[in-house]
Amino acid sequence: MFWALLFTFLLTQRKKMDFTLRTYRKLLVALLHKGYRFITFEQYCMLLPSQRRERFVILRHDVDLKAENSLRIAQIENELGICASYYFRIVPDSNKPEVIRAIAELGHEIGYHYEDMSIMQGDVDKAYTHFQEQLAYFRQFYPVRTICMHGAPTS
């Protein structure tokens, strides 16, 4: 049902893909009007199996580049009463402490978008140490409980 709704919504957007914030807001509002509840990945992990039958959207953002754009998205979600999961990398385009802090203060989940094996060129021991250090870094902004791998082949 969700995918059918999303597909129909996208088709009505002037027959072209429209990735503007205005259209994103419209999509969120359409899902809210259809009775979907938005939850973070952390919230999903805490659901009982019986609760997983409800209509919900796990809203997750991988912040690979342009962290400032993620803040604008987080503000829109906050205005609509929606919480999402934001996964940040440690690279300069993603790792903007002021943005991470602002998104966390809006009530969104913060997670670590890790790529430690790639950064440490396959050295497992160094990657493990690096992972622990970076996780501690992100935990200064939010009590990180979920992580997701970046798409690098050796992450």
Regions found by a protein language model. Give the residues of each.
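Catalytic alpha-helical scaffold of carbohydrate-active enzymes acting on polysaccharides/glycoconjugates
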Residues: 2-155
